[in-house]
UniProtKB/Swiss-Prot annotation:
Organism (species): Colwellia psychrerythraea (strain 34H / ATCC BAA-681)
GO biological process, one term: regulation of translation, ncRNA-mediated
The UniProt record lists the keyword RNA-binding: yes
Protein name: RNA-binding protein Hfq
Gene Ontology, cellular component aspect: cytosol
Length: 83
């Protein structure tokens, strides 16, 4: 199942890391808005005026307010290959 999460986790992590506002549409048509505070295999914690725990199986669509860069952010251990 790790293969199926190879797109989902970096996408949600970029939303969380960059604090990108999102609209989450549930399968019943309800629209939730806020920022992804955290997530795991089963839920997303969405923060607005209150925090809401949203089960992933109830989510239809996640719409970011702007473009999302899922490329990994270079860390302090990454070295340039100028040599």
């Amino acid at each position: 199942m790790a293969k199926g999460q190879s797109l989902q986790d970096p996408f949600l992590n970029a939303l969380r890391r960059d604090r990108i506002p999102v609209a989450i549409y549930l399968v019943n048509g309800i629209k939730l808005q806020g920022q992804v505070e955290s997530f795991d295999q089963f839920v997303i914690l969405l923060k607005n005026t209150v925090s809401q725990m949203v089960y992933k199986h109830a989510i239809s669509t996640v719409v970011p307010s702007r473009a999302v860069n899922t490329a990994p952010v270079p860390g302090p251990d990454d070295q340039s290959s100028d040599a």
